Design a protein with these regions (language model features):
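Two-component histidine phosphotransfer core
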Residues: 1-115, 119-127, 135
Length: 136
């Protein structure tokens, strides 16, 4: 294993949502980002993936950790990319590709927020507004 005893993870998903298709490697890229950039030396990092129903046609996919979080420069780059589509050196390829794929598949029916938790760690919130045929 590449990072032995460096992190632990927990995945929770409401039973009714398990039938909703989620594009491959979307969640994995954000989890990979948490592992690659969020680990604190000598401290166990907790990574959580939660998938929950917000309303009849909306689900929330949340990836969060208690690691180092994003630097201010990285958060600025993320915000600029999410709002204007401008890619900077501070922004990772994985985030760009995942956001681009989500927007390609869901268009304006997808909301993405990337931010730091108050004490430590990063959070990625992906809200999908599903079609009636996809709803849970």
């Amino acid at each position: 294993m590449r990072y032995p005893n460096a992190f632990d993870y927990k995945v929770t998903c409401e039973e009714a949502i398990k039938i909703v298709p989620i594009p491959p490697f979307i969640i994995e890229s954000f989890v990979g980002n948490a592992i690659k950039h969020g680990l604190k030396p000598g401290k166990m990092t907790e990574i959580q993936v939660n998938v929950s129903k917000l309303e009849e046609f909306r689900i929330l996919i949340q990836v969060k950790d208690n690691g180092t979080g994003f630097s201010d420069d990285s958060l600025d780059a993320v915000e600029e990319f999410l709002e204007k589509g401008i890619v900077s050196e501070e922004l990772g390829v994985g985030i760009c590709n995942s956001v681009a794929r989500l927007r390609l598949i869901y268009g304006d029916k997808c909301e993405i927020r990337i931010y730091n938790q108050e004490l430590s760690g990063a959070v990625v919130d992906i809200t999908l507004n599903l079609q009636k045929t996809e709803a849970v």
